[in-house]
Amino acid sequence: SGVFTITGCENFIIRNLSFIGPGSVDVGGYDLISVVGSTHLWIDHCSFTDGMDGNLDITNKADFVTVSWCTFVYSERSYAHAFSNLIAGSDDPSQGEYNLNVTWANCWWKSGCKNRMPMARFGVIHLYDNFYDCPGASVCINPQKESNFLIENNYFSPGVNRIFSQKNATAYVWH
């Protein structure tokens, strides 16, 4: 669940908004935005700061979601679980085995982001022209169970510990 939960919506646009949470202090808190089972959603030119559990999570058969020109950051208020973006919330195939087509374009992960930029189970994920400026991040991109990633023309600043960690997934990377 999220501070803002978008459930079962179709043809929905979120644009030019700032979402600021109290800080990432535990895994049991809310996401700033939780997209649940919605289709044809566009999130554009938004900023996400200090989500409790995550900044923007996309789950439960959401489909055809585009996140563009957004920024994600965790400040000093976030001392645990600074994991920004999750796609599919569990290993259960009903989460989105044939859904979860998600594009991340021209986004910027800034300081404090440690992991899940994004992490996905299932789905087809396209990442292009994104900027990872998050020194100290444990790992940026996490393809997981049965997900397919197309990763194109992304830039990773110095100081990122691991750019990529893959588990039971397919990823194609173009530089």
Positions of the model-derived regions?
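Right-handed parallel beta-helix
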Residues: 2-103
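A generic "binding-loop/recognition-motif" signal
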Residues: 10, 39, 52, 114, ...
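A structural signal for beta-strand register positions
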Residues: 18, 47, 71, 106-110, ...
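Generic hydrophobic/packing signal
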Residues: 30-32, 107, 117, 162
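Short catalytic-loop micro-motif centered on adjacent basic/acidic residues
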Residues: 42, 55-57, 116-119, 139-142
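Aromatic-anchored, glycine/proline-accented short structural segments
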Residues: 81-136
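Extracellular beta-rich repeat passengers
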Residues: 119-175
